[in-house]
Amino acid sequence: MAARRSLRYSGNPGAKHSKNTLRSTYSRKQKAGPKPRPKDVFDFSNNSDASSIPGALEEEEETYETFDPPLHSTAIYAEDELSKHCVSSSSLATHRGKASRNLDPSEDEASGNESIKVSTKKPRRKLEPISGESDSSADDVRRRVASAEGPRSQQRQAAPAAPSPPERPAEPVTPRRTRLHSAQLSPVDETPATQSQLKTQKKVRPSPGRRKRPRRGHTDTDGSESMHIWCLEGKRQSDITELDVILSVFEKTFLEYKQRVESESCNQAINKFYFKMKGELIRMLKEAQMLKALKMKNTKIIANMEKKRQRLIEVQDELIRLEPQLKQLQTKYDDLKERKSSLKKSKHFLSNLKQLCQDYSNVQEKGPKGTGKYDSSSLPALLFKARSILGAENHLRTINYQLGKLLELD
């Protein structure tokens, strides 16, 4: 803790002065009266070492002290001044809030290395060591920082690696700068702002993304272990397709390959690829089954249509063959119809004629007997009676004619 520190300021690199000139310039600046406070301010606390800086009693009364950087690029100061500067910078950092916590550790270390460097030159004057009270306070602060960083490191180790790294959560001030500041703090300088900062460091928890993503990966691994294996044993050989064989072989290959992979991120990527590929194959299988069913229905419909078409052709041929028969039957029907009508008419005529004869006979029986007289009106009746006589005469003539021919031949 007794080592010397040096602050580097941007000055004119061409100007060169001796160390004695620098020290005399610095003593004149210290003895000068108070000036308006510039941007670069060193706030000296009450616990600073009085022997390291002349006129300590006068400086305690002054609230601020001006400081003009020398022309030389570096200047040597006591460790007490450096501690006071660190205390003021830490109080400013607490007022800034989250902006100082989001800094990258590499950037903080680089800025710390540029602003604060250990001086390797020979000391010009002796410095008194820091009191034991400041050492004890520094140890307490270190212990608090270590206790705040312990659970964070354990939580980071316990969280499994996600496929895509989540956003980096807001980190507190880097350990190196914190140790440097806390080593110089005293019990009086430990403000409520620093205490609240330490409490917030203890209460920091990993972001929600880090807590949710490992659970999702865990469920994926559990789901992959309890996944459904595509089985071909219960199917008939005619129902098994190329996609069924590909899917079963793909699942077996996936399980064998997954047992050989140890990386969690690789397992998650393999699981995603497997589930997407399996879903695509199952979708293709369902579409193939639907296509097969539609083809079977289509073939059945086509077969029924062919049967009906063949039957239609047969009926047309039969109709063509039976058409002349239909015409013949139609003519026969017409003839029979005419005969039926003629028979009805003849029957009606005969019935009327019979009735007439009956009436005539009845009249003759009732009337007086006398010679019959025939006139022209009775000609039809005479012809009807002579019909039998004329028929016998014609019959005798035919017999006579035939006998004459036979005699001529003899």
From Swiss-Prot:
GO cellular component, one term: cytoplasm
Regions annotated as coiled coil: 291-352
Post-translational modification: Phosphorylated by PLK1 at Thr-74, creating a self-tethering site that specifically interacts with the polo-box domain of PLK1.
Major localization listed first in the record, in broad terms: cytoplasm
Compartment(s): Cytoplasm; Nucleus; Chromosome, Centromere, Kinetochore
Gene3D superfamilies assigned: P-loop containing nucleotide triphosphate hydrolases (3.40.50.300)
Modified residues (Phosphoserine): 106, 111, 115, 131, 134, 136, 182, 186, 224
Biased composition range(s): Low complexity: 151-161
Region (Disordered) residue spans: 1-72, 84-225
Pfam families, per the entry: CENP-U
UniProt motif (Nuclear localization signal) ranges: 4-21, 295-312
Modified residues (Phosphothreonine): 74, 191
Keywords: Centromere, Chromosome, Coiled coil, Cytoplasm, Kinetochore, Nucleus, Phosphoprotein, Repressor, Transcription, Transcription regulation
Biased composition (Basic residues): 16-36, 200-216
Subunit structure: Component of the CENPA-NAC complex, at least composed of CENPA, CENPC, CENPH, CENPM, CENPN, CENPT and CENPU. The CENPA-NAC complex interacts with the CENPA-CAD complex, composed of CENPI, CENPK, CENPL, CENPO, CENPP, CENPQ, CENPR and CENPS. Interacts with MLF1.
Family, per entry: Belongs to the CENP-U/AME1 family.
Protein name: Centromere protein U
Source organism of this protein record: Mus musculus
Gene responsible for this protein: Cenpu
